[in-house]
């Protein structure tokens, strides 16, 4: 039965990977459509669209899908009218959570997000209830094996960045004001800096310590369920979990 078991495991992993890929396609198509609607269909003149197209390449999306999404955004093709919605609430342990969604039916999405919060021990709140716990930033990831700390810090500041965070083992995290992200990225590219990723994000101003495995497990289930929703683009939370508990959860 060893062969059968191995096949079964591969099938399950492939099904999961395909599902994740399908969800990523949906999320990226929505982002491309909205970016094109708001800033036009030319990626050279629309930095948000350019980054969305790069994300499409990362998930191996066929270019014809990308082009159709752009045309739907610009109105050249008839398509779904998406709107951006933000939800705020609390998770297990009092963790603040912000959910960014893109939807063609706000009522449906709101009901689904509320259900997910309730099912996994959270509580969907009103607009503004937790957003003060985060600040908007642009982040640019640069591989650590390419540059020394001094070198990347000097280049980042010269490019107009606010700071460089060194915590990640693989990447420097260059932080910018949200409005300066695309400009700083372009300045770095002109300097020949290799960029792994650039995106707008929310960074917690304070964190909630989760020190027991049960609460951590509930929180992870809530965050996973939110991210699995087709309308959800990004999920932010201000938790801090000790390495010892994280290792158990991953195990």
From Swiss-Prot:
Domain of life: Bacteria
InterPro entries: Integrase-like_N (IPR017856), TACO1_YebC-like_2nd/3rd_dom (IPR048300), TACO1_YebC_N (IPR049083), Transcrip_reg_TACO1-like (IPR002876), Transcrip_reg_TACO1-like_dom3 (IPR026564), YebC-like (IPR029072)
Any one biological process term the GO annotation gives: regulation of DNA-templated transcription
Pfam families attached to this UniProt entry: TACO1_YebC_N, Transcrip_reg
Annotated keywords: Cytoplasm, DNA-binding, Transcription, Transcription regulation
Annotated GO CC locations: cytosol
Any GO molecular function: DNA binding
Annotated compartments: Cytoplasm
Similarity section: Belongs to the TACO1 family.
Protein's recorded name: Probable transcriptional regulatory protein SYO3AOP1_0685
């Amino acid at each position: 039965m060893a062969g059968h078991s191995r096949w079964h495991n591969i099938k399950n992993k492939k099904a999961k990977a395909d599902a994740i890929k399908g969800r990523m396609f949906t999320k990226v198509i929505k982002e491309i459509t909205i970016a094109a609607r708001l800033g036009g269909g030319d990626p050279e003149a629309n930095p948000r669209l350019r980054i969305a197209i790069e994300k499409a390449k990362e998930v191996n999306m066929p270019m014809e899908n990308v082009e159709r999404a752009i045309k739907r955004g610009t109105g050249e093709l008839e398509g779904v009218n998406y709107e951006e919605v933000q939800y705020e609430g609390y998770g297990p342990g009092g963790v603040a959570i912000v959910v960014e969604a893109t939807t063609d039916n706000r009522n449906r999405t709101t009901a689904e997000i509320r259900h997910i919060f309730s099912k996994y021990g959270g509580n969907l709140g009103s607009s503004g209830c937790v957003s003060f716990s985060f600040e908007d930033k642009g982040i640019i990831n640069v591989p650590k094996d390419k540059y020394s700390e001094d070198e990347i810090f000097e280049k980042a500041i010269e490019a107009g960045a606010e700071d460089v965070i060194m915590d990640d083992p693989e990447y420097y995290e260059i932080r910018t004001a949200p409005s300066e992200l695309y400009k700083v990225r372009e300045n770095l590219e002109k300097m020949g800096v290799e960029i792994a990723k650039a995106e707008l994000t929310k960074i917690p101003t304070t964190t909630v310590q989760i020190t027991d495995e049960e609460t951590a497990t509930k929180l992870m289930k809530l965050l996973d369920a939110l991210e699995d929703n087709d309308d959800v683009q990004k999920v932010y939370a201000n938790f801090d979990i000790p390495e010892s508990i994280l290792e158990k959860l991953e195990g």
